[in-house]
């Protein structure tokens, strides 16, 4: 009986040690995954219903697909704007959206870019872009078939393209 009790105590102690010594890794999605889902969903909702872009009605158009190369181009541009403290479609070295997309491996034929700064959520930046005629028209352009986006320190970038 004493030997059985010692065995139980031994396994309980070992079990407790293992339980308390193992660290669980946090189960969170990366911001990129969250952004890709919510941004693509918001843009496609807009494209599904059509909308007013300034004084021009933009009719419904086909949904976009997510493109990892355009996402990388958006990430690169957001990082560049943040690290070099500028806000423009053309970098201080003269790089334009199509060049950034090609550098990221994008092989499509058409690239349009929206940028935003100091917005705190996808909803906020989407509202701002929808209220700007040129940004709204970029999101509604029927030539676009794919998109990628990124945010870094409140620098938002959308890249649209045609594959």
What are these regions (language model features)?
Residues 1-10:
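Bacterial N-terminal signal peptides that target proteins for export
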Residues 18-21:
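C-terminal motif of bacterial Sec signal peptides marking the signal peptidase cleavage site
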Residues 23-26:
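Bacterial signal peptide processing site
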Residues 28-83:
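A short alpha-helix/helix-coil micro-patch that ends at or immediately precedes a cysteine
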Residues 56-57, 89-91, 138-139:
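Short, hydrophobic secondary-structure boundary micro-motifs
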Residues 69-121:
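Short, surface-exposed glycine/acidic/tryptophan-bearing loops
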Residues 108, 112-163:
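Disulfide-stabilized extracellular recognition modules
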């Amino acid at each position: 009986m004493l030997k059985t009790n010692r065995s139980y105590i031994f396994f309980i102690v070992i079990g407790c040690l293992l339980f308390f010594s193992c660290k669980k890794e946090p189960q969170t999605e990366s911001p990129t995954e969250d952004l890709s889902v919510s941004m693509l969903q918001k843009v496609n909702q807009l494209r599904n219903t059509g909308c007013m872009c300034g004084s021009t009605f933009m009719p419904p158009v086909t949904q976009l697909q997510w493109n990892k190369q355009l996402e990388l181009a958006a990430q690169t541009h957001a990082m560049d704007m943040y690290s070099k403290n500028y806000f423009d479609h053309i970098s201080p070295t003269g790089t334009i959206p199509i060049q950034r997309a090609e550098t990221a491996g994008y092989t499509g034929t058409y690239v349009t870019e929206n940028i935003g700064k100091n917005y705190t959520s996808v909803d906020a930046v989407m509202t701002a872009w929808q209220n700007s005629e040129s940004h709204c028209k970029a999101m509604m352009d029927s030539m676009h078939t794919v998109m990628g986006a990124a945010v870094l320190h409140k620098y938002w970038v959308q890249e649209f393209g045609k594959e």
